[in-house]
Every structure is written in C-alpha cells, then in structure tokens.
Curated annotation (Swiss-Prot):
Mitochondrial membrane ATP synthase (F(1)F(0) ATP synthase or Complex V) produces ATP from ADP in the presence of a proton gradient across the membrane which is generated by electron transport complexes of the respiratory chain. F-type ATPases consist of two structural domains, F(1) - containing the extramembraneous catalytic core, and F(0) - containing the membrane proton channel, linked together by a central stalk and a peripheral stalk. During catalysis, ATP synthesis in the catalytic domain of F(1) is coupled via a rotary mechanism of the central stalk subunits to proton translocation. It comes from the Eukaryota. It is found in: Mitochondrion; Mitochondrion inner membrane. It comes from Helianthus annuus. NCBIfam families: atpA, PRK13343.1. The lineage of its organism: Eukaryota, Viridiplantae, Streptophyta, Embryophyta, Tracheophyta. Changing A228L: In strain: cv. CMS89. ATP binds at G171, D172, R173, Q174, T175, G176, K177, T178. F-type ATPases have 2 components, CF(1) - the catalytic core - and CF(0) - the membrane proton channel. CF(1) has five subunits: alpha(3), beta(3), gamma(1), delta(1), epsilon(1). CF(0) has three main subunits: a, b and c. One of its GO terms (cellular component) is proton-transporting ATP synthase complex. This is ATP synthase subunit alpha, mitochondrial. The keyword Transport applies.
Length: 510
C-alpha cells in the first residue's frame, strides 16, 4: 500500500517546527596555548584581543594579555601555570581586570583579584571597579588643605601630611617603615571616633606586596586587637604568590580606595612596598622578552609607579571633595637613595620620610632623619597651633646636628653653643615614641611646646619620658581642647599651659 502524505499537513508541520526552532549561539574568540612556563603563556589565534584584556584558560585560571605580537600573544597567568599545558584552549572575556569595592570590603583580607582569603565567606553587597583607570584631571582637583594625622610626634610636627597628599616612606630594611604606616592606621581609630559626619571619617587600605604570610597574619592580629579592622581593608599579594599578582595588588587596592574618594569620603592607602612590585614587574617583563634598561628594569617602570600614585588626589568641591592619601614605601640598599627605583618615586611624590639604620640602633625610634625628610604640601594642612609651636624646631635641630659634629673634637664651648647643644639633645629626645602608641594631636602639641619653650632644658635626658607621661596623665581636658581652637596660641592662651608645664617640670629638674 502506497503512502501519500497530504501537502497541507506537511506544510503546517514544517512551519510549526521552523517557528519553534531557536538557536542561542554564543560566539567566543578562542586561541590555543603554544608554550607555557614561568607564569607566561604564549597563545596563538587571538587576533582581535586588546592589550590588558582578561582571558580564561581551560583550567579556569585567568590571565591578562600584555604583549600583542604578530605570531602570538604573551599572556601573564594570575595563578599557578601547572594546570595549563600546550594545546589548551584560551577564551577571550571581553573585559579588563576589575575588583570588588565598597563598604562591604571593610574588615576583610583579600587577594590581588579581590577574592577573600580570611575564611569569612563571600563578600556581601558591593560594586566592581576597574583596577586601571585614569587619574583625576587638573580641574577635578583641589590643593591639599586638611590634615591627616599620623599620631607620631616626629611626623605631625616636622613632616606634616595632608589629605590627598602622597608621602613616600623610604629607608633600609628593619628601620621601622611599616611601623610608621601601621601607627598611622591605628591613630585613625581615635580620629574617626571624633568625626561628626561621614565626610570626616578616614578609611584605610593596606596593600602588602611580597611580604611573608606570617607578617600579614601578625598585622591582621594587631589591627583586630585595636579594633582598627572595622575601617580597614587588607590586600595581600604575599611572597608565595605569582609575580603578576604582586604587580597587580597596588592597582587593586587603589581601586578600592578610589570608591571612597569618588563618593565624597576620605581614604588612606599604604603600598608596602613598591620596590617589590617593581621587581615583580621586572620579572614579568624579562620573561615577556621586553628589552631591559637600567638595573634590568623595563623602560616603562617610571610609568608603572606614576600612573598609580597620580590616582591619590584631593577632589574639588564640585566633584565631591573626597580624597585619597597615599603612603608608598620604598626599601633602599645600604641607604642608597640614588638608586633607580628611589630616584623614580621621589619626584612623583609630595615629600618623603627618611628612616635610617644608624638612628634606629641609637634608640631614636621612629628612626626619622629630620634633615632629609620633607613634606612639600603638608604645611598648608597643618594645624595653626602646631605650626606655631614647632616653627623654629627644625632649624634648631639642623643647627644642633652641625654643632654636635664639631663639638666632638673640642671641649671649650661658649655658653651659646652649650645652650644650643643642650636644647638640641632635648628636641631629639622628645619625638621618641613606642610602637603602636599613637598620640592625639593636642597632646603632641603640649609635649612639643614643653620642649621648644625650655621646660625640659634643666632635666636629665632619661627623665624626659617620665615628664611626658606626667603631663599626659594630669592634663585637663579643657586645656587640651583649647589647643585645637583655630586662632592658635595667643599670649593670653599661653599662660595656662606655661603654668601647668612649669608645675609638672619641678619634680624632674636638677
């Protein structure tokens, strides 16, 4: 029996099938790994890829395209390259590196890609920001005029820092560079407790580059015990992490800090340290076969740091009046500040705090060399009272260092020289401070006022710290508050502190 389907039925059936037919094609440009090793993958076939674009390997590991060549693309791998092998597929993502940002990040420890590593679960509500963005333009900026207190007498009096400034901390290893940065974070606890609005609070971002994991864990413990983690974010690219993550970590931390800057708030970011970032970038560049320059660093190592530090800024009132203050750390070798990386970063920043091994071992801690340290814009942000009190102390310290060198050779000194040596020794003693014990600015003013105005001149040097403790123990709150008033110290206002300091000095003078 012959089967002859009706034409109408076939037509209807085909039409219904065609109308229900749906394809959701996703077109991805893919390439294949030609070679891989030392964290660098050479990939063939990604002809349309853009510089700085993220890619994904078959193993799930991410990477970023840095070298675009005729035959292949040089990709640095964010993670272990052991799971990647020759012939693996590589897929373009069409996006550049971004990280989470927002207040949900506060109190968390994350890696260079913003993934939490503190074992406290995923991040809650947050936005994502690109790690590489242009720095604010000239019109969007405003000159630095608000103080950023560190809680260290040596810094707040002689090398003041303002919100939106970039102040370099430079020195040999084991001279207390990180201690200065940590004390600054701890000091914001008491500063934030006084703030009356969100626009006064200072949030902190600490970026650990190439440090030991034990050091980072110790830092988390110190900040947690001081309740400082509640306003801090830690970005850690430790020594065991691949070089690309150590290179990326400062930019990731900066993107997190920019969230506060761009939303009318204030943030402080510490890069500890940029020398290790430069070394990681040198390793990547040499493996990508880029031509080496001085000290084998690539030619664009200046741009590596300048584009990062230019993102620290004080925004104008029209753009929200937020700020991002940067404290980059650079490690020198045997005090050589004329090496390549230090000479690159010093002109980018607005001043430097120099720490020295010799001062550290002499017991002057923080070991800050006041002669070499400078703040190019911070004095505009300094409190008027502090400016009045320590105005002449930097000159006196410079004269003291000059005379002290000569006084070693001869004992016949006139009375004026003897008085200068005596005062200089006391001005050197007063800025000494124990670690993790930042002082509020009004207490700093009072202690420095006592030294500058001669209340310590007749005291033995070993009694000055006792005198300082006695001042801080018995001071009245009203007197401290009067030191913060905008008018500065007038002759009438000086009478009360003078009387108080004279009474406190009596038990300690010879």
């Amino acid at each position: 029996m012959e089967f002859s389907p009706r034409a109408a039925e076939l037509t209807t059936l085909l039409e219904s099938r065609i109308s229900n037919f749906y394809t959701n094609f996703q077109v991805d440009e893919i390439g294949r790994v030609v070679s891989v090793g030392d964290g660098i993958a050479r990939v063939y076939g990604l002809n349309e890829i853009q510089a700085g674009e993220m890619v994904e390997f078959a193993s799930g590991v991410k990477g970023i395209a840095l070298n675009l060549e005729n035959e292949n693309v040089g990709i640095v791998v964010f993670g272990s390259d052991t799971a990647i092998k020759e012939g693996d597929l590589v897929k373009r993502t069409g996006s550049i590196v971004d990280v989470p940002a927002g207040k949900a990040m506060l109190g968390r420890v994350v890696d260079a890609l913003g993934v939490p590593i503190d074992g406290r679960g995923a991040l809650s509500d947050h936005e994502r920001r690109r790690v590489e963005v242009k720095a604010p333009g000239i019109i969007e900026r405003k000159s630095v005029h608000e103080p950023m207190q560190t809680g260290l007498k040596a810094v707040d009096s002689l090398v003041p820092i303002g919100r939106g400034q970039r102040e370099l901390i430079i020195g040999d290893r084991q001279t207390g560079k990180t201690a200065i940065a940590i004390d600054t974070i701890l000091n914001q606890k008491q500063m934030n407790s006084r703030s009356t609005s969100e626009s006064e609070t200072l949030y902190c971002v600490y970026v650990a580059i190439g440090q030991k994991r034990s050091t980072v864990a110790q830092l988390v413990q110190i900040l947690s015990e001081a309740n400082a983690m509640e306003y801090s974010i830690l970005v850690a690219a430790t020594a065991s992490d691949p070089a690309p993550l150590q290179f990326l970590a400062p930019y990731s931390g900066c993107a997190m800090g920019e969230y506060f800057r761009d939303n009318g708030m204030h943030a402080l970011i510490i890069y500890d340290d940029l020398s290790k970032q430069a070394v990681a970038y040198r390793q990547m560049s040499l493996l990508l076969r880029r031509p080496p320059g001085r000290e084998a660093f690539p030619g664009d190592v200046f741009y590596l740091h300048s584009r990062l530090l230019e993102r620290a800024a004080k925004r104008s009132d029209q753009t929200g009046a937020g700020s991002l203050t940067a404290l980059p750390v650079i490690e020198t070798q045997a005090g050589d500040v004329s090496a390549y990386i230090p000479t690159n970063v010093i002109p980018i920043t607005d001043g430097q705090i120099c720490s020295e091994t010799e001062l550290f071992y002499r017991g002057i801690r923080p070991a800050i060399n006041v002669g070499l340290s400078v703040s190019r814009v911070g004095s505009a942000a300094q409190l008027k009272t502090m400016k009045q009190v320590c105005g002449s102390s930097k000159l006196e310290l410079a004269q003291y260092r000059e005379v002290a060198a000569l006084a070693q050779f001869g004992s016949d000194l006139d009375a004026a020289t003897q008085a200068l040596l005596n005062r200089g020794a006391r001005l050197t003693e007063v800025p000494k401070q124990p670690q993790y014990a930042p002082l509020p600015i009004e207490k700093q003013i009072l202690v420095i006022y006592a030294a500058v105005n001669g209340f310590c001149d007749r005291m033995p040097l070993d009694r000055i710290s006792q005198y300082e403790r006695a001042i801080l123990k018995s001071i009245k709150t009203e007197l401290l508050q009067s030191l913060l008033e905008k008018g500065g110290l007038t002759n009438e206002r000086k009478m009360e502190p003078d009387t108080f300091l004279k009474e406190c000095a009596l038990p300690y003078t010879i």
